[in-house]
UniProtKB/Swiss-Prot annotation:
It comes from Streptococcus thermophilus (strain ATCC BAA-250 / LMG 18311). InterPro entries: Bact_CCA-adding_enz_type3_sf (IPR050264), CCA-adding_enz_C (IPR032810), CCA-adding_enz_firmicutes (IPR023068), NT_sf (IPR043519), PolA_pol_head_dom (IPR002646), PolyA_RNA-bd (IPR032828). GO terms for molecular function: ATP binding; CCA tRNA nucleotidyltransferase activity; magnesium ion binding; tRNA binding. It catalyses: a tRNA precursor + 2 CTP + ATP = a tRNA with a 3' CCA end + 3 diphosphate; a tRNA with a 3' CCA end + 2 CTP + ATP = a tRNA with a 3' CCACCA end + 3 diphosphate. Belongs to the tRNA nucleotidyltransferase/poly(A) polymerase family. Bacterial CCA-adding enzyme type 3 subfamily. This is CCA-adding enzyme. Catalyzes the addition and repair of the essential 3'-terminal CCA sequence in tRNAs without using a nucleic acid template. Adds these three nucleotides in the order of C, C, and A to the tRNA nucleotide-73, using CTP and ATP as substrates and producing inorganic pyrophosphate. tRNA 3'-terminal CCA addition is required both for tRNA processing and repair. Also involved in tRNA surveillance by mediating tandem CCA addition to generate a CCACCA at the 3' terminus of unstable tRNAs. While stable tRNAs receive only 3'-terminal CCA, unstable tRNAs are marked with CCACCA and rapidly degraded. Homodimer. The lineage of its organism: Bacteria, Bacillati, Bacillota, Bacilli, Lactobacillales.
Amino acid sequence: MKLSYLPSEFQKALPILEKIKAAGFEAYFVGGSVRDALLNRPIHDVDIASSSYPEETKQIFERTVDIGIEHGTVLVLENGGEYEVTTFRTEDVYVDYRRPSSVSFVRSLEEDLKRRDFTVNAFALNENAEVIDKFNGLADLDNRVLRAVGKAEERFNEDALRIMRGLRFAASLDFDIEEKTFEAMTSHAFLLEKISIERSFIEFDKLLLAPHWKKGIKALLATKAYQYLPDFQETAEEWQSFVADYAEDFRFTSSEQAWAATLLALKHDNPRSFLKKWKTSVNFQKTVQSLIEIFRFRMEREVTKQDVYHYGKDLLKEAETLRQAQRLDVDYERIAELDGQLLIHDKHEIVVNGGKLMKELGFKPGPDLGRTLRAIENAIVDGELANDEESIMAFVQAMKQV
């Protein structure tokens, strides 16, 4: 098969291929970028595979960086771009269900493509826009099927993360998982316990943000892969409710929103403890926790000025979007209106600070000063006190007389 035209992302990288070929080696575009070109999807990273060994690649180009030379990868800096050029290779036995014990460089493209995960990721594309398809990936692409390259059991036993990648591809491409591939995913799902949680997080996060995330969650359920992820041992009913609760075409707008929705559906009591196990950042944990808090109090009451001040209008709107997707009442206008009424959005905007109270009104550092500052802040937020020095000092004087 031949593409009707070579997408601009490949055209920009074409001089890399031409230089490698001029030096007497083979070179092709490979991987997900070729698949995305065939599907008319946006192309992101353009990867190049070559029969040139790393040291040979480095001799061809003036500017290179060793970013994974032991695995055959050299970063080529050319024409204002950065391109990963990886030598054709085969891989030895996988020792930890994630990484091969060793790699061997080869001159054969087919041997290199044989180690790929799925047939739709095992294409190569030459400089003439001709697609090399050694494993019937084009047929799978037409049929929207996700099939492992070769024996599915071997692919997942080599690298258990491919199970999560498969679920993610089902969600992002809207593909069905081929029967034997699905069976191998299910029988090897227990190996996910061997995979670093950081890598599992990346794949699950991408699944949640995919346009067809519901398909990915349904496959996660069907394979029972969720049982081997940290703190995800909930009943199938809770996972099914997660899918059922949201409008069919709903897409999450951020990772934080997606994880908040997940934890809400699974009824986790301690979201921050859960997210800590998934090795997420403190800021990520705080944001997810806040979204969960907002969603829960919105089931009981409407938004107040204090809520807008504490959480910020953007986070409140993000939580409101989850309500809208669950066909619950929303009030974006009230959030915007209350935000417009706030005299301050941060306590540092208050014109009087603790130092001034100590200097002019004799306060000492301690609980009394803290209580007074919080009272000033709350009164300004509630609109009961103007944010000017005269009003604040009078407010404090009145407090001291009570």
